[in-house]
Structures are given as structure tokens and as C-alpha cells.
């Protein structure tokens, strides 16, 4: 009798991001430097491009590959001016991680700041067109506390037309 294979393999979460990039080998180096990623597997295509790569950042997996338009694959976000998707990472020390990401080549989209929802938070764009938000949770709050803090924060914001 055969054991049933798990639908979600050990170590995976239900949702796993899979990124398409231009120059996946350079992206692998960037994610290692910027986010401390561990490269678990790289499957090269016959032409040397990366068909599939598996990385681990903290307790989560990230998959990526080079563009393969000749196989009907999607273009990298850098081909279209960016992506509407943001990947979020919780870290023990967001200040150090943010500095590492910028040092590795990320551009700052929103500088780090203490947010009304209890996180120290900022956003960067990687050199491959993907956006990342980085945070350290600094304060647990009840829904009522968060609502009060949100009202205070929004009261300070400029009004849109």
C-alpha cells in the first residue's frame, strides 16, 4: 500500500510566488545579497538561461525563471514598466535588511517608517522590476487601537482632489 502524497509539499505554504525576470542568474545573486536567500535548486535550459530556480527566504520558498517568450511565457515586469504585485517580507531587523537591499541594488520606493498598524515598514524595487515591502512587527494592537491610529494617520495626510 502506498502512502498518499501531500498536495502541498513539506516546507511549502499554500501560495508560493513564482517570478519571471530578465537575467535570472543575476537575480539569484541579488536575492542572496539583498534578502539572505538560499538557492536550493537551479535548472538550466539548454541555452543556459534559468528554466526554474528555487530559493528560500526565511521560512518561505520563492521560485523564479528567465523570460521564455518563445515558449509562451510571460515577460518580466521590467519589460512592461513594472508590476502591480508587491512581495512582503517580515524580518527580525528591517533596518538592516532594508540597508542590505539598497546596497545590493534595490531602489527605495518608500523609506522606512513606523506605521499606524504596528509595523516598521518600507518598500523597494529590485533591479528586475519586482516590488518588495519589508517590515518588522513592532506593536500588537486591538482592532480599536488600529482604527484610532489609522484615523490619526489619515488626518495628517494631504487631501486628494
Task: Cite the ranges covered by each PLM segment.
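Vicinal oxygen chelate
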Residues: 1-18, 28-29, 35-125, 135-161
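C-terminal catalytic core of tyrosine-transesterase DNA break-rejoin enzymes
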Residues: 128
